Amino acid sequence: MKNIAVVGYGVIGKRVADAINVQDDMSLIGICDIISDWRIQNAVRKRYAVYAATPEAEKEMKAANIAIEGSMQDILEKVDLVVDCTPKNIAAKNVEIYKEQGIKFIVQG
């Protein structure tokens, strides 16, 4: 079983997370984002573990009463693969992090 994280839980990321969640050979470790609105509330309702992509996002999520499992670094320590669904300017920065840590990744966005 492969442990997968979805970074970016927007239009694409929510669909990718749902698809991963129904696979027999994959485990969705969680989703990671900067938002604290209804999209993340939907992830919580689906019982997806939520991780904050930035310290600012962590503060906003806590203010919105969203239970978070940790930071982006925390989720990266648990995965075999990341599917990055962030906008291209963010994904480009994230790719450098994945490469530095030797994490396999797919950029989907």
Regions from the language model: what does each represent?
Residues M1-G109:
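N-terminal Rossmann-like NAD(P) cofactor-binding subdomain of oxidoreductases
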